[in-house]
């Protein structure tokens, strides 16, 4: 009887942990999609909130950017679409990899770029925030 009770309690704890992590993955995926949408809609308020003040940004050209430099670029963007998202959660840290298709305009004219990216998110005061991001160009 005791063994069955202990097994039942452990099963409930494990199921809760699995569902909890699934919920967190859904929250993180929502942050990633909302961030792409914010770039598309030039929602600087959201971008200021979702990126940590001391975010580490490595561009597809290998440049280190500040949060302010990243947000200044928003006006050039027409759309950002993220796909193939994979999430790994390690406590209050999440690692997201995926593919991004970005279109926009710059001094050279219209562009369309495809990237593989990695975002590192940290859960701060109950909210997921991007603390590091790196992109690698898939265009040859």
Across the structure, where does each feature detected by a protein language model lie?
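Solvent-exposed loop/turn segments at secondary-structure junctions
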Residues: 44, 54-56, 62-64, 101-103, ...
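Short solvent-exposed beta->alpha transition segments
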Residues: 48-81
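Sec/Tat-exported extracytoplasmic proteins
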Residues: 32, 39, 43, 51-55, ...
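Surface-exposed, charged secondary-structure patches
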Residues: 71-109
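Hydrophobic pocket/interface hotspot
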Residues: 35, 47, 55, 70, ...
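A mature extracytoplasmic/lumenal domain signature
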Residues: 51, 61, 86-91, 100-102, ...
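Short, low-complexity N-terminal intrinsically disordered segments enriched in polar/charged residues
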Residues: 4, 8, 15-49
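Short beta-strand edge/turn micro-motifs at domain boundaries
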Residues: 114-139
């Amino acid at each position: 009887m005791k063994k069955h009770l202990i097994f039942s309690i452990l099963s409930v704890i494990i199921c809760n942990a699995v569902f909890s992590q699934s919920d967190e993955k859904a929250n993180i995926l929502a942050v990633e999609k909302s961030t792409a949408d914010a770039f598309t809609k030039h929602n600087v308020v959201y971008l200021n909130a979702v990126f940590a003040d001391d975010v580490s940004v490595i561009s597809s050209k290998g440049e280190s950017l500040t949060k302010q430099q990243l947000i200044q670029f928003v006006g050039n963007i027409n759309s950002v679409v993220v796909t193939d998202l994979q999430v790994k959660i390690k406590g209050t840290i999440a690692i997201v990899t995926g593919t991004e298709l970005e279109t926009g305009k710059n001094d050279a004219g219209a562009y369309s770029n495809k990237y593989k990216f990695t975002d590192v998110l940290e859960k701060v005061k109950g909210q997921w925030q991007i603390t590091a991001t790196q992109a690698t160009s898939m265009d040859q």
